[in-house]
From Swiss-Prot:
Subcellular localization: Nucleus
Pfam family for this entry, one: Fip1
Biased composition (Gly residues): 301-321
Protein name stated in the entry: Pre-mRNA polyadenylation factor FIP1
Start-end of Acidic residues biased regions: 1-11, 31-58
Species annotation: Gibberella zeae (strain ATCC MYA-4620 / CBS 123657 / FGSC 9075 / NRRL 31084 / PH-1) (Wheat head blight fungus)
Highest taxon of source: Eukaryota
Function (record text): Pre-mRNA polyadenylation factor that directly interacts with poly(A) polymerase.
GO biological process: mRNA processing
Claim: Nucleus is one of the keywords in the record: yes
Amino acid sequence: MDIDEDDDLYQPEEPKLESAPAEDNKPKTDDLEEGEEEDEGAAMDEDDDDDDDSDIDIITERKDGTKPAPPQQSKYSDIRNIPQRTASNDMPAQPAPVKQESESRTSVNVAAPSADKTSAAASKSTIDVNVNPIHPGTGKPITQVNIDEDLPENDKPWRKPGTDISDYFNYGFDEFTWALYASKQETVRGEFGADVFAQNNKKMMEDFNMMMMGGMGMPGGGNSGGQQAGMSGGMDGMPPEMQAMMQQMMASGMDPSQMDPSQMNAMFSGMQNAGGAGAQGAQGGQGGNFGGGFGNNQGGFGYDQNMSGGGGGGGRGGFGGRGRRGRW
């Protein structure tokens, strides 16, 4: 009994069949078929999607033939939606420049050179601007040497081909520009040289003195006595009129010695003509007085009324006057 119960509790295992490996191969075939079925299902789904897309039609026209109105757009863009960028994000903050007071102070404290220092620096130069050296070959000043006439052909090596002209002429000069420069120097020295200036002043003073001496004898004989008295008391025998005019010229700041001789002659001749006219006027006044006295005398004494002249006229006038007084 006990064994039967144990048999019921513990049943013997069933023997395994040899068809088990065949069952293992089945799932492989089943898997392939399932994969193929999946591919076929995906292809069918794509065909269904294509059919769905082909069924969608886009209609842009209405049934009545009019096109729908386009959607309204705002005239102005919404500026509020535009993100604003701040300057602080764009530009990095730069540090403030530091003032360099020391450099500015040193630049301000630099003093300009004084006149004494400038003159001392200028006095160190040994160049004489008035020098005109003598050419040893010709014995003439260097600015008066004529290259074509004074120098022989052998003394012109700069004319040879291949010669560097800067070995004979400095500062960019050549034979032609040096001739022009020398001529210009001679002209300037002739006009503004110290010797020429002194000679011109001397000649001007001589002309001035000759003009003064010739002008003293010009006035007429009527005023010769007064002029001689004026010359004796005047300056260097100068007439009073000339002396007064010279004083006026010097008082106004003019130097008579620096004036043009022709201008001085014109001034003195005008003054002398004015003096001669005054003398003639004085003589005419004397003649008028003499004629008037003669006429009065003739009128008083009752001289011949037929006498011609200024005196007779005066007499006739007097006689007529007496008659008119009688008639009144």
